[in-house]
Each structure stands twice: as structure tokens, then as C-alpha cells.
Amino acid sequence: MSTSNNLVPLSICVLTVSDSRTPDNDTSGDWLVQALQAEGHRLAARALLPDNRYLLRAQVSQWIADEDVDGIIVTGGTGFTGRDSTPEALLPLLDKEMPGFGELFRAISFEEIGTSSLQSRAFAGVANATFLFCLPG
């Protein structure tokens, strides 16, 4: 069995959803960009938006419609506070949800943060052949 890495570099957009972060202190977004580039992927675009479902939906819809975008990673807005609206904003955009992703994410998180992992509404799916992953901030 070959152990060579046949990575196909992807063009990925990163969106941070936060009412308190700025480009200067967006540590989650910075980490995601560094991690995807370290694996050989390309940053297609990056944005930081407040917790506003209509702004989120508009930005992600634009990226989904762009044939040059292979994937989108959204960080933030997946909790249970009154302003957290990432799932409500983006689930309607999916053509297909990725069953089990949220459960797996919470199971892995449980090993590090215990029952606090239950506060995440992480999810993933596909829209217009673009993969979408929504993670806690």
C-alpha cells in the first residue's frame, strides 16, 4: 500500500462569525487559515461578520455560487446564545447535510472539554458541489 500523499489542493474560504472579534484578534480564523495553508490548500477568501443571519447567508451564498471555491469553513455562531444564528442562517443553503459530522465533532471535543462540547451545534454539508463546515468559534 502506498504511503504517498495525493493531496489535491483546494480553494477554501474562511468566515469568522463574531460580535466581538476584529481582524486583529480573530484567533480562530487565523488558526484555520494557517492550518489549511500548512496542508497545502489555498485561501480563496476570508471574512469576519457579526452574528447576523442575513449577512452570513449573503456572504456564504456568494461563495457557494463561485465555481472556483471548493470549500467553506465557518467558525463561530454555533452556540445557544440569543445572537448565535449560524445554523439557522446556513442550513437552508445546503443541498445535502453530512450526517454524523456534528456528532463526531462533539464526541472528539468531549475528550478535551467534557460536557461543554454539548454547547456546539457544529454541522457540515454540501451546496452546489461546495463543502461547508460550521464549527464553534
For the regions a protein language model found, what residue spans apply to each?
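Non-catalytic beta/alpha edge segments that cap or flank active sites
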Residues: 1-137
